[in-house]
């Protein structure tokens, strides 16, 4: 990591899923001037979800991309600085913390919130991606409702399925 600091911020948020945008909303309301880097998939995993029926405030449901856009707009309304970029290196050994963005820009931050989310593990079988969200699911808790009273196959091991 370079010793050259390109920018100093009070609050740096890495990730733009529900946790990242929620952190940006609260940090903005607390006048922490948050800078949020969206990462490799702006909006996070929910952008690949067709229908979200279990999020409070949306009694008729909402698509994942629409929900994430609503959260992003709310964070922007409160003053969050949302940028595209990927955190490629971190030095969290001592405050202020140093985060390298896109292998080039070094940001020094008083506070770092890491909200990088999760990535589903798939089997890698033919047509699996083709049917993601249309029969192939990576979240039994999230999507089980859609398959009630239907014959399903659940694949997993240990405490995950």
Stretch-by-stretch model annotation:
Residues 2-3, 47-106:
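N-terminal Rossmann-like dinucleotide/flavin-binding domain of flavoprotein oxidoreductases
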Residues 1, 21-22, 85, 98-102, ...:
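A generic local structural motif
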């Amino acid at each position: 990591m370079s010793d050259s600091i390109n920018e100093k911020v009070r609050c740096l948020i890495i990730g733009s899923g529900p946790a990242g945008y929620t952190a940006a909303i609260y940090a903005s309301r607390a006048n922490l001037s948050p800078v949020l880097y969206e990462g490799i998939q702006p909006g996070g995993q929910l952008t690949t979800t067709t229908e979200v029926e279990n999020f409070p405030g949306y009694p008729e449901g909402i698509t994942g991309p629409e929900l994430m856009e609503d959260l992003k707009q709310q964070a922007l309304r409160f003053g969050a600085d949302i940028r595209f970029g990927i955190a490629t290196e971190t030095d969290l050994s001592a405050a202020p913390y140093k985060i390298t963005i896109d292998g080039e820009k070094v940001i020094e931050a008083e506070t770092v919130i890491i909200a990088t989310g999760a990535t589903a593990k798939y089997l890698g079988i033919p047509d699996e991606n083709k049917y993601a969200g249309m029969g192939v699911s990576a979240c039994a808790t999230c999507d089980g409702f859609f398959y009630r009273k239907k014959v399903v196959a659940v694949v997993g091991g240990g405490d995950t399925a």
